[in-house]
Amino acid sequence: AQGDSGYDIKMDATPAYGGMGEGATPTEMLLAALAGCIGIDVTMILNRYLDKISKLEFITDGTRKEEAPKGFVAITITFVVDGDIDGKRVWRAIDLSEEKYCSVSDSLNAEITYDIILNGVKLTREV
């Protein structure tokens, strides 16, 4: 797949699910997208303090349902921060990202709809 930015994104299933294991799985990409979105927001919000931060790392972990579809029931993003910055500022940046800026976290709560275009024709649900 290729995103709007022009970069190639390689995804694949694990061998256990019939893939070759030659790319990130879609669920790994989902967690990465969430961490990336919030991480970029937090970095931008904390921009004027970045000279005081020596490490800013984001680690994601998700718990999925046992049965299909095995969507996430809980996601934890751990922010690893080293530097001379008040923890309240970091919490505020995270809150602002989640409540106001991060389109990925907002999308995880959104109603999902589907479109099908088959051979150049958009299908309606009645087909």
Predicted regions and their residues:
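Extended beta-strand/beta-hairpin segments
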Residues: 1-32, 43-127
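Alpha-helical metal-binding/catalytic segments enriched in His/Glu/Asp
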Residues: 34-38
